[in-house]
Amino acid sequence: VSLSNHSIIATGKSTMSDTKPTMPRRGDFGWQPLVSAFEPTIEDMMSNRAYFGMPPEALYLWGTFRDEDGEIYCPMRRVPAGLQTDAKDTRRRFYLCTTLGHQDGMHMHPVGKNSVPNDGCSKTLEGERIHWRSHPQAPGNRFHVTWTPDECSWYEENGMDIEGRLVKPGMHWYLPGRDAGMYYVANIFEMEGTILGKKVRGMIGFDPIYMYEGGEIYKTKDALVQEKLELVWYTWATRYKDGSIDFGHFTLGNDMFGFAILGNEKGEVRYTYDVTGKVDFGANGYWQEGIRYSAFGDEWEFIPDPKGRLVGLGTLKNPQVDGRWRRVGDTREPDVWFAWGEAAPEHGDRPVNRLPDLGTRVGVNFRKY
């Protein structure tokens, strides 16, 4: 090695060219995820331990409900982990988007303005049930959330009172990266109760997320956004009138990002990284109007609800749309469902591998074991 090369390294000057990389740097793997099912436990839900060097970022409660008149309700609350590493809490209250009084999609309902902020909320284990409660002296309508490995409840004073059972098992996925990444833990619950006094049925995600210190989903250290990986990200479930159920996660992205997890009413789970598809952004170029998706040797389609656009969230990089996933040609009649997810129009409408020298991933048939 020449002295001139040593000098460049010592002074910290980069020896890399300005051309776009064709393979990952050390510590990156081309944005390949790792996914599987898992068994939810009280111990794990109570713990504040880090996974893969990522502390808890927050617990996300969110879902889709429909009343007897077909009106749609999408509630959401982000509960920070309460650690010193937490990012500033910019989503501090209960939010509810609904089609009530609107024909063009879901708008923000004012009930959230009077909800209690997350400041000082508590997390306790009482018997075999975990409780999250708003601070008793905090101003606003209180909240109370409970969880066990089998059931949960979510109460927002003067707004919502729902409860239900886990669609088993849990699902989780990990996206490694040297500076940005995510570990996402998904618990889907089938729920019923009342929202704004209306009887409703639907599904929610009860999902802890882990990110590098200071990270916050969609904002900082989120590779799906800052690396422009994400094309499609949906958590979804459908129970049919014959009692069968499909549920899972469907993602699609650039480079090596993308996977599908699929479960059924027997608790059987399959997962694959061999996925592809295309998003139809229509003439508007922003709101997706349908998705074609290939996984497990089947063709799938996302059917947006005619009023499924969450316009109340404002203009986003990843506009949110609710609807329903199904296999192409599936004639089963849905009974209760949710598929609230997103597509990112600025990232493209179909996958692109921007790392052509990464190498070829070869699948393994684990059935041989």
Name these PLM-found stretches.
Residues 3-369:
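Targeting-peptide/extracellular-domain and disordered-appendage signature
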